[in-house]
């Protein structure tokens, strides 16, 4: 495995782990909790190079880091009308999860939760992946790098990571950049830490907002989508 691929794999693993870290792995039952004290913890994440989107839904007692809950009838959760089954893991506790094809996921979706009193809470969101237009050339010369996107807001924010294949260099890692009118500019001076050769380029957009239709305890919706590219960086040709 090259350093580029190794570093990329580590960064993705760390990013995904951070989505679920610092939470309790204890498991309880929703029947033992006041319905108004249930916290909704919703996560949707996908990558361009993965064929599926993952929808992960958790219900907790004691806020975002509290005890995870198993839904007892008549409580249930549906995603776009399809009921989810409970699963569990040592790290995260109880959760409700499904995968959907990325190719057909663009657009509006609804998460429908029913509590023990049969009260329904519908949480709607829209999933819009972004793309590079046009794609990145195989070779880029040093200088200000300009990238153009579709699928972003007029002013949007992306997490940007650039890594090279040299173990001696200091990478540009996890910078946050503003994209204006679909245009991202990475200034030439920021490339000084990278050596010439293969460059791994990762871009992620994250949306993190409070639940709009939840209990008194509230909740959080986190949506994450990313893409990766590789190109060769070389010195600008002298005129």
Q: Where in the sequence are the language-model features?
A:
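Bacterial N-terminal signal peptides that target proteins for export
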Residues: 1-10
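Surface-exposed beta-strand edges and their flanking turn/coil or helix-capping segments
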Residues: 126, 136-139, 162, 173-175, ...
